[in-house]
């Protein structure tokens, strides 16, 4: 039987007060989708995400002018805030100094290994981890053009080079992600990452997964495989939808796999010719009412004598 327990072999890092890796439960994340200048809007979204069960929140920091807003959000946020940085090592350094609980940098656009040195120094001084976040759509051009490697191998090669560089600089609080938009590539990549770097905590996800229905199917199929095999220390289900739906999806998947429970599980039959009641609207109404209940209970709604009372 595959191992569904949290991966105790990975190095544990702290994101604020949240333990990630080292046998800790898989941490649920989401990402804010408002401009940083809307401080109150972002804080309101963080509060809603926290109520939904989010444990770590990420926010894009695209411009130097955003840093003051970012700092204010970090100070007032009830959740640890991860700074999502692309294209600028300087922004990563400043975000570390201004309250980020963790940095996310992209090897494909941060400016090369040497540009990462001051970022590592800033993170070490702040006592925060860094996620090396590789994406299939933004691989380093030299690596992307190699014909001797498959796409999963390219993603793993990029991540491995940066992790080894970080370790060589004496920085070990590293988390890795390597995402693609399709499930087979995602699963193959994370399996290979887990084999190549078993001690490094992994942030799992299917990037650009799509709108609610498609995104849920793709993410559940891909992440479900990985989590069932004990791969994944933290997760985000990326959806083109309200971020709270991402959090609900994460908890539903973790619950379905028997890994973590915080909300009710609705058990309802699909209906057939034996159904004695108009079950579909009843089940939908029960599901709606259960949204505000946060207890790991089971609630059954059945429509005939085969599966249960009507």
Residue ranges and their predicted role:
Residues 33-42, 50-77, 104-112, 174-183:
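Glycine-rich, proline-tolerant flexible connector loops at the mouths of alpha/beta enzymes
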Residues 90-131:
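Hydrophobic or amphipathic alpha-helical targeting/insertion segments
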Residues 1-31, 36, 124, 288:
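N-terminal amphipathic alpha-helix/helix-capping segment at the start of soluble metabolic enzymes
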Residues 134-135, 143-301:
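Catalytic alpha/beta core domains of metabolic enzymes, predominantly
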Residues 64-85, 118-130, 192-202, 286-290:
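Alpha-helix-loop-beta-strand connector modules within alpha/beta enzyme cores
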Residues 10-12, 25-29, 56-58, 80-84, ...:
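Structural preference for beta-strand elements that scaffold enzyme active sites
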Residues 53-55, 98-113, 206, 229-243:
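Glycine-rich phosphate-binding active-site loops on the catalytic face of alpha/beta enzymes
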Residues 15, 22-41, 60-62, 79-87, ...:
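Active-site mouth loops of central-metabolism enzymes
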């Amino acid at each position: 039987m595959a191992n569904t327990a949290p991966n105790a072999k990975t190095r544990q890092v702290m994101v604020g007060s949240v333990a990630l890796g080292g046998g800790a439960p898989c941490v649920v994340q989401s990402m804010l989708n408002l401009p940083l200048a809307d401080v109150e809007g972002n804080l309101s979204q963080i509060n809603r995400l926290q109520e939904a069960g989010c444990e770590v929140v990420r926010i894009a920091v695209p411009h130097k002018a955003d840093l003051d807003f970012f700092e204010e959000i970090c100070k007032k946020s009830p959740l640890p805030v991860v700074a999502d940085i692309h294209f600028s090592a300087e922004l990563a350094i400043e975000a570390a100094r201004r309250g980020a609980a963790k940095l996310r940098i992209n090897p494909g656009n941060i400016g090369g290994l040497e540009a990462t040195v001051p970022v590592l120094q800033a993170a070490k001084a702040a006592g925060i981890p860094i996620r090396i976040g590789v994406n299939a759509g933004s691989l380093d051009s030299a690596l992307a053009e190699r014909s001797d490697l498959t796409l999963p191998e390219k993603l793993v090669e990029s991540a491995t080079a940066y992790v080894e560089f970080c370790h060589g600089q004496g920085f070990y609080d590293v988390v890795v992600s390597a995402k693609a938009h399709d499930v087979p590539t995602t699963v193959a990549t994370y399996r290979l990452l887990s084999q190549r770097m078993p001690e490094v905590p992994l942030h799992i996800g299917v990037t650009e997964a799509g709108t609610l229905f498609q995104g849920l199917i793709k993410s559940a199929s891909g992440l479900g495989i990985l989590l069932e095999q004990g791969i994944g220390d933290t997760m985000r289900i990326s959806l083109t939808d309200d971020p709270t739906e991402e959090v609900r999806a994460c908890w539903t998947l973790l619950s379905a796999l028997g890994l973590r429970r915080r909300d009710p599980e609705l058990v309802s039959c699909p209906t057939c010719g034996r159904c004695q009641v108009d079950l579909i609207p009843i089940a939908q109404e029960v599901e709606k009412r259960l949204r505000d209940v946060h207890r790991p209970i089971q609630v059954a709604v059945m429509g005939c004598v085969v599966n249960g009372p009507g």
